[in-house]
């Protein structure tokens, strides 16, 4: 799937618990970051060539960060109350915060990033039970979420159990349902 196709799958995310507040959905993957905002007036979605593995390998470029910054600047900062992280990186960040946390403010996210930055790969695995394929990139994923949260300082960061693959399944089910209803009529 292309990055924009991945971003479009975020619209299938069911976020009933956040229905009364504006939310920005963010999926930080290894090679890209997808954002989706749907408010009463418009839908915005975009994929950026910024991912945790790209940063780890030094492949992130200033122009990619600038594209993300420009996209975020076109969203009313007072409007967003929730940054909902999609996927494993977001869940691992919340896990690092502790058992009783379900959301983080900017200061808490920055503290976690700082703490993770001081740990070796082995310590991240043993202390936080991070999978080995996630332990080396989690700090970089946290950097991306922090960058976004800096634009929406009043927002809280949440992690969802949902993944992009769930969006793909919901999309396919919707297509099948639509095709079936057309056959019946």
Predicted features and spans:
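Active-site-adjacent helix-turn-beta-strand microarchitecture at beta-sheet edges
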Residues: 28-32
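Helical "lid/coupling" subdomains associated with nucleotide-phosphate turnover
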Residues: 1-22, 36-185
């Amino acid at each position: 799937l292309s990055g924009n196709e991945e971003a479009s799958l975020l619209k299938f995310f069911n976020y009933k618990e956040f229905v009364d507040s504006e939310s920005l959905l963010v999926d930080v993957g290894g090679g890209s970051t997808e954002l989706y905002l749907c408010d009463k007036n418009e839908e915005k979605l975009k994929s950026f060539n910024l991912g945790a593995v790209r940063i780890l390998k030094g492949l992130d470029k200033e122009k990619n960060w600038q594209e993300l910054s420009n996209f975020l600047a076109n969203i009313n900062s007072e409007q967003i109350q929730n940054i909902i992280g999609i996927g494993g990186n977001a869940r691992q960040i919340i896990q690092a915060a502790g058992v009783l946390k379900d959301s983080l403010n900017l200061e808490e996210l920055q503290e976690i990033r700082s703490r993770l930055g001081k740990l070796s790969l082995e310590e991240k695995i043993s202390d936080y039970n991070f999978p080995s394929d996630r332990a080396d990139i989690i700090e970089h994923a946290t950097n991306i979420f922090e960058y976004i949260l800096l634009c929406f300082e009043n927002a809280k960061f949440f992690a969802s159990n949902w993944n992009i693959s769930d969006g793909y399944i919901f999309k396919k089910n919707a297509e099948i349902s639509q095709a079936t209803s057309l056959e019946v009529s």
